[in-house]
Amino acid sequence: MGVEWLVEKLQEHDITLNDKQKQQFQTYYELLVEWNEKMNLTSITDEEGVYLKHFYDSITAAFYIDMNQELSICDVGAGAGFPSIPLKIVFPQLKVTIVDSLNKRIQFLNHLADALDLRGVSVVHERAENFGNVRGDNRESYDIVTARAVARLSVLSELCLPLVKTGGHFIAMKSSKGEEELEEARFGIGVFGGRVEAVETFELPGDAGERQMIIIEKRSKTPKKYPRKAGTPNKSPLLK
């Protein structure tokens, strides 16, 4: 299982990869394994696992939201670049901003963007609470904000929804417990200006596990007092 497997699986969803994109994915895999020996980027390093559980899994967001247009995307807590870098490779017109609080991951992502010759990728070393506060230019400025298995949805909603422009979407990419998390997060989602538009449940190929994608539309502006100061959303999520 490698890049040709990815090509085949994406074609089932009318997504075609050219030679440059195939090479970008292969280089991505090689750099991920190389840098992972120096720093802990991922516990999944075998080729099959990376292509399935990182690359393919990241691109599933495009099965439910049309990415064939010029969109601004902010990826909160992207770690080794998931889901935003695979999406950027497949849809090069996307304008991507990645926010991560750990400097070593920022170093990797900057190197990766250069090595893959990606244009329109900005990597920011910052906590999401600070990035989305009322004093910055980033608040309510993105068409799509993504987060993939970073924290519970009740926490992520406070970090991500302030960054989404009205009419845009927050996409939370979760495992099989996404709907469970959604129940406790519903109150906060409403407070932050969001409305649950869809919950998409699907299986990864090869019985590799269930995934749930929670798509939240931004209906109104987030009150200025959110997000609260760094660390507070995680310690005391807004549940009711």
UniProtKB/Swiss-Prot annotation:
GO terms for cellular component: cytosol. InterPro entries: rRNA_ssu_MeTfrase_G, SAM-dependent_MTases_sf. It comes from the Bacteria. It is an enzyme of class 2 (transferase). Residues 217-240 are annotated as: Disordered. GO terms for molecular function: rRNA (guanine-N7-)-methyltransferase activity. Its EC number is 2.1.1.-. Keywords: Cytoplasm, Methyltransferase, rRNA processing, S-adenosyl-L-methionine, Transferase. S-adenosyl-L-methionine binds at residues 77, 82, 128-129, 148. It is found in: Cytoplasm. Specifically methylates the N7 position of guanine in position 535 of 16S rRNA. Belongs to the methyltransferase superfamily. RNA methyltransferase RsmG family. This is Ribosomal RNA small subunit methyltransferase G.
